[in-house]
Swiss-Prot record:
Catalytically driven reaction(s): 2''-O-acetyl-ADP-D-ribose + H2O = ADP-D-ribose + acetate + H(+); 5-O-(ADP-D-ribosyl)-L-glutamyl-[protein] + H2O = L-glutamyl-[protein] + ADP-D-ribose + H(+); alpha-NAD(+) + H2O = ADP-D-ribose + nicotinamide + H(+)
Full protein name: ADP-ribose glycohydrolase OARD1
Macro domain segment(s): 2-152
Described purpose of this protein according to its UniProt entry: ADP-ribose glycohydrolase that hydrolyzes ADP-ribose and acts on different substrates, such as proteins ADP-ribosylated on glutamate and O-acetyl-ADP-D-ribose. Specifically acts as a glutamate mono-ADP-ribosylhydrolase by mediating the removal of mono-ADP-ribose attached to glutamate residues on proteins. Does not act on poly-ADP-ribosylated proteins: the poly-ADP-ribose chain of poly-ADP-ribosylated glutamate residues must by hydrolyzed into mono-ADP-ribosylated glutamate by PARG to become a substrate for OARD1.
PANTHER family reported for this sequence: ADP-RIBOSE GLYCOHYDROLASE OARD1 (PTHR12521:SF0), PROTEIN C6ORF130 (PTHR12521)
Domain of life: Eukaryota
Active-site residues, Swiss-Prot/TrEMBL: 84 (nucleophile), 125 (proton acceptor)
Keyword Nucleus part of the UniProt annotation: yes
Subcellular location field: Nucleus, Nucleoplasm; Nucleus, Nucleolus; Chromosome
Annotated organism of origin: Mus musculus (Mouse)
Length: 152
């Protein structure tokens, strides 16, 4: 069961929901952070790997840090924000912003209007949510894309 925590605080384009990310509407595209090597061996990435597979498809896209790899599943896009070279590395805010810009471009070209995601980069990667959310707001400010962030 998801619980909506806010609608639009101070003009924010991010809505926060307490609940399971994978219970989001089936029309929402999803996003999370991974490394170039597509290991997805820990954290929420493991759940993405189990649910959507496609590791070879992701690797074949040969995306680098600051880019985005994409799978299409059941009529929606699954975005893999490439924020670091190896799974054992830590991401930078710069690479996160570049990968978000790449995702935004793909969303706009493909008519994506709703994105759901966890607090990207803030679990095992240890980025600070106040910085990440500010980057998200900045990157998507000139779009009509709605972002829903799920927390457990």
């Amino acid at each position: 069961m998801a619980t909506r925590l806010n609608e639009d605080p101070e003009g924010s384009r991010i809505t926060y929901v307490k609940g399971d990310l994978f219970a989001c509407p089936k029309t929402d595209s999803l996003a999370h952070c991974i490394s170039e090597d597509c290991r997805m061996g820990a954290g929420i990435a493991v759940l993405f790997k189990k649910r959507f597979g496609g590791v070879q498809e992701l690797l074949s896209q040969q995306k680098k840090s600051g880019e985005v790899a994409v799978l299409k599943r059941d009529g929606r896009y699954i975005y893999y924000l490439i924020t670091k070279k190896r799974a054992s590395h830590k991401p930078t805010y710069e690479n996160l912003q570049k990968s978000l810009e790449a995702m935004k471009s793909h969303c706009l070209k493909n008519g994506v209007t709703d994105l759901s995601m966890p607090r990207i980069g803030c679990g095992l990667d240890r980025l600070q949510w106040e910085n990440v959310s500010a980057i998200l707001e900045e990157v998507f400010e000139s779009t009509d894309i709605k972002i829903t962030v799920y927390t457990l």
